[in-house]
Amino acid sequence: MTKPENIGIHGIEVYFPSTYVAQEDLEKFDGVSQGKYTLGLGQTNMAFCGDREDIYSLSLNAVNNLMDKFNVDPNSIGRLEVGTETVIDKSKSVKTVLMDLFAKHGNTSIDGIDTINACYGGTSALHNALQWMESSYWDGRNAIVVAGDIAVYEKGPARPTGGAGVVAMLIGPNAPITFESGLRGVHMENVYDFYKPDMDSEYPRVDGKLSISCYFRAIDNCYNRYAKAFEKKYGKSFSLDQVDFALFHSPYNKLVQKSFGRMLYNDFLNNPNDSRYASLEAYKNVKPEDTYFDSVLEKALSAITKNDYATKVAPTTLLAKQLGNTYCGSTYSGLLSLLDEKSNDLVGKRVLTFSYGSGLAASAFSFKVEKPINHIVEKVDLKNRLAKRVRVEPEIFTEKLSLRETRHNLKNYVPSDETTNMFPGSFYLSSVDNAGIRKYDRTYSTSAVLGAFQRRQQISQSTIKSLNLFRATKSVLSILKK
């Protein structure tokens, strides 16, 4: 078999819940100062789920929508891997649930499984897919990588940093968005900055200050190791000057702003005599670990990077601000935000990427956009879908999270949330039996059903219009469910 070239992303899709809470509303509800969440964290809205949605249903929606929008033949997929830390079952993987989308088409020969380490699982799943395609085990088929989570926190200062969403990516050779082979910097260590030892709760245990220290230390190491790989491959020094765009794992947007400054700080340490860094002279001989919480340095870096942040990073932040932290999906929702914002202007551009998962695992790597990607942007239709969401009052948001809390790990029940506000065609949890087996159904509208049927069967709009809508809807539901 011919060695595949230009491996990368052919299609990308995100599924997010149809409900969200505005951070400005949460500020009032929580009785905190105006701007604490919107300015202090840099967040706008936060997606959330009630008891009708879980990581299985979100992932089913992301993969099903990806396959539908990009006309993916289920039998063309040879690897399916999921990165998530939202664990429903200590044994059964999310990937096995997703197999329902393929087995009904006769494809049960699909490699891959779930990958778990906090927010890093999606990146590990992605790298596994790339390495599979580069190996002797590759069978010529494409891969789908799934990355996402439902991020919830108990009442308190961390709750506004939650979120929900799942990204699915179609990976294959000769892609418009390619990975720069051999360019990666990795850092991993054993630390308890964020972890979930209690299987009876969705809530994590978090040492916030330690986690920020770990995040910055990981950036320092990954960035410099990526720089060395770049210099080895291209024979020239690396700095942010070689980067057209930069995207980051985003627990909250303010940390992304600081992280971009952190990369420039490393450029300064690597080239302290550059006149652009004159205001940082006092930090020339200071240990990096002593600067993590230095407010004077932070302000200086913010001033130096202000313009570059606006052009290189801000275009990646839409979904992070609108959905909140999607954990494993965070980095790739940033990529999708960038595609939506810049479209074909990205052709020929390098996108430096930093992915972080507590515990910890992190890496820096890069994409290059080799071909026009406006067709991807049009199919995802991101901003229109965001605009169709339902804004929910903080009181209702709090009730929904309380409901999730009481029903976590519960058996023998039927979820009580309404499905009327869900996006048409969405999978949702319909019941959990006394053995803990979960059942799913789908929401439908006439237009959504007929639209999906038309795409699946490749029949004309005029033919659709000639059908009796009620009869057509009833008849095609059975086809779409097969």
From Swiss-Prot:
Which molecular-function annotations from GO does this UniProt entry contain?
A: hydroxymethylglutaryl-CoA synthase activity
- Provide the binding site for (3S)-3-hydroxy-3-methylglutaryl-CoA: C119, T161, S211, H249, K258, N325, S358
Give the reaction(s) catalysed: acetoacetyl-CoA + acetyl-CoA + H2O = (3S)-3-hydroxy-3-methylglutaryl-CoA + CoA + H(+)
InterPro entries, per database record = HMG_CoA_synt_C_dom (IPR013746), HMG_CoA_synth_N (IPR013528), HMG_CoA_synthase_euk (IPR010122), Thiolase-like (IPR016039)
Look up the record and name the pathway of this protein.
Metabolic intermediate biosynthesis; (R)-mevalonate biosynthesis; (R)-mevalonate from acetyl-CoA: step 2/3
Keywords, A to Z? Lipid biosynthesis, Lipid metabolism, Steroid biosynthesis, Steroid metabolism, Sterol biosynthesis, Sterol metabolism, Transferase
Catalytic positions are: E85 (proton donor/acceptor), C119 (acyl-thioester intermediate), H249 (proton donor/acceptor)
Key word Hydrolase present: no
EC number(s) of the enzyme? 2.3.3.10
A single Pfam family it belongs to is: HMG_CoA_synt_N
Which GO biological process annotations does it have? Answer: acetyl-CoA metabolic process; farnesyl diphosphate biosynthetic process, mevalonate pathway; macropinocytosis; sterol biosynthetic process
EC main class here is transferase
Tell me the superkingdom of the source: Eukaryota
Looking up PANTHER family in the UniProt record yields: 3-HYDROXY-3-METHYLGLUTARYL COENZYME A SYNTHASE, HYDROXYMETHYLGLUTARYL-COA SYNTHASE A
Summary of the function given for this chain in its UniProt record: Condenses acetyl-CoA with acetoacetyl-CoA to form HMG-CoA, which is the substrate for HMG-CoA reductase.
Family the entry assigns = Belongs to the thiolase-like superfamily. HMG-CoA synthase family.
**NCBIfam families per the record?**
HMG-CoA-S_euk
UniProt protein name = Hydroxymethylglutaryl-CoA synthase A
Native source organism of the sequence: Dictyostelium discoideum (Social amoeba)
